[in-house]
Amino acid sequence: MQLNPSEISELIRAKIQNLPSATEARTTGTVISVTDGVIRIHGLKDAMQGEMLEFPGGTYGLALNLERDSVGAVVLGEYEHISEGDEVKCTGRILEVPVGPELVGRVVNALGQPIDGKGPIQAKASSPVEKVAPGVIARKSVDQPLQTGLKGIDAMIPIGRGQRELIIGDRQTGKTAVALDAIINQKGSGVICIYVAIGQKASSIANVVRKLEEHGAMDHTIIVAASASETAALQYIAPYSGCAMGEYFRDTGRDSLIVYDDLSKQAVAYRQISLLLRRPPGREAYPGDVFYLHSRLLERAARVNAEYVEKLTNGEVKGQTGSLTALPIIETQAGDVSAFVPTNVISITDGQIFLETDLFNAGIRPAVNAGISVSRVGGAAQTNVIKKLGGGIRLALAQYRELAAFAQFASDLDEATRKQLSHGEIVTELMKQKQFSTLKVSEMAMTLYGVTKGYYEGIPVKTALKFESDFLSNIKANHAELLADIEKSGKLSDENDKKLAQAYESFKAGYNFA
């Protein structure tokens, strides 16, 4: 069979016309070096800051340093298979994580992938991990309480929905315990909780999951885990991923609470990445933008107004405000709150709960130091009954600590000082609370009423907690309607005041303190 030249040209023309025309212009680069998960790439002229880069084997990275002739990136995951000379592609996308109610009750990694063995998550929406915080006009003042269920915190350092309250203290002072109690106490309140574990042991994270499951709190909780065995990049990204998940609920007119446990480890991971990227080190070898690292994260926690929610939901949700409350945790070294990262986060947040080693070791748990703990905006959000009854608690504790220091050297004390010391001892004892035994507002009000009205005067300090527990049981059995009324209204009416006074008097008169 012979073909003449005209037939050959016809065949070639037909082939060219039928070729698929879907071409894709992609910028590619070459890996120059791999150092502990930080990769330097030659080329990629069009790469954007924070853009996802595609490595061989379906691995992705994040472009962080854009230099004249190279790009510095971190790998999100395993990097052992990446070697010098590998081809890298730009994706034109920024890092996104799945968000929505489908994640509730699940344990995910920093990229939103499930790690609890319960199958894939069919999330209908996704969100960028880095987002601009709501502006001034979109925000609403904090005026709704977020109850932690802990007497010492709800009475002295109240937290409002949309607030950022720092939990700070040395290791082993009960920081995580306070945060977990706050999560457990949101059961039935409609608040969705996100617990972000950064740089912790995998066994510790498993223990947290088990405790939350035992207390029925996983039904309203998402856990984002970036354990100590994960790369520095994933530990750096985890808080932003968790925040994006919490923002979904805030922006759809719901309330959410996020715990970052802890941001000290995130700062260390970011320092590691920055030093490997050869960014100039500053104080304590942290990079110059470590303040911005935390400020851009914590500014995303806010209470937003109904107009903002309506706009973001395209009119589906009307007349509802949303909030994201943040409880960042910072670990100090030997109680040094003047170190670089602690001072940064203190200045960003709306107050701090300072937990002290000495108090913890003395059996005062939660080990809250009332003197330097503060809530800058929570007072406006405090429940009326707690505000009314708990006003003197903080002052009593602060005065007691001051007097107790002087009383050690004084042999003869006047009556007023002795009275103040005994009152302070009782208050200190009553602020103790076991872990996972959170109280409702009405139950808390019973104790605060007794302290404020002097019904605990003359009671032996050792029996104060037993008296409190027995009185609560008595009230639940005989005056359940009183508790229900206070719980519903959040106020103590004159009628209920009289009933409560009578209940205390009759119970105390017949109580055996032996």
UniProtKB/Swiss-Prot annotation:
The UniProt entry lists the main location of this chain as: membrane
Q: Which GO terms describe its molecular function?
A: ADP binding; ATP binding; proton-transporting ATP synthase activity, rotational mechanism
Q: Which UniProt keywords apply?
A: ATP synthesis, ATP-binding, Cell inner membrane, Cell membrane, CF(1), Hydrogen ion transport, Ion transport, Membrane, Nucleotide-binding, Translocase, Transport
Any idea which positions bind ATP? 169-176
Q: Which reaction does it catalyse?
A: ATP + H2O + 4 H(+)(in) = ADP + phosphate + 5 H(+)(out)
The protein's topology relative to the membrane is: Peripheral membrane protein
- Which domain of life, per UniProt? Bacteria
* GO cellular component annotations of the record: plasma membrane; proton-transporting ATP synthase complex
Give yes or no: UniProt keyword Cell membrane: yes
Q: Does the keyword Transcription regulation apply?
A: no
In this UniProt entry, which residues are annotated as the site Required for activity?
373
Q: Which InterPro entries match?
A: ATP_synth_asu-like_sf, ATP_synth_asu_C, ATP_synth_asu_C_sf, ATP_synth_F1_a_nt-bd_dom, ATP_synth_F1_asu, ATPase_a/bsu_AS, ATPase_F1/V1/A1_a/bsu_N, ATPase_F1/V1/A1_a/bsu_N_sf
What EC identifiers does the entry list? 7.1.2.2
Q: Where in the cell is it found?
A: Cell inner membrane
Q: What does this protein do?
A: Produces ATP from ADP in the presence of a proton gradient across the membrane. The alpha chain is a regulatory subunit.
Subunit info here reads: F-type ATPases have 2 components, CF(1) - the catalytic core - and CF(0) - the membrane proton channel. CF(1) has five subunits: alpha(3), beta(3), gamma(1), delta(1), epsilon(1). CF(0) has three main subunits: a(1), b(2) and c(9-12). The alpha and beta chains form an alternating ring which encloses part of the gamma chain. CF(1) is attached to CF(0) by a central stalk formed by the gamma and epsilon chains, while a peripheral stalk is formed by the delta and b chains.
**Which NCBIfam families does UniProt cross-reference here?**
atpA, PRK13343.1
Tell me which family the UniProt entry assigns to this protein.
Belongs to the ATPase alpha/beta chains family.
Protein name, as recorded: ATP synthase subunit alpha
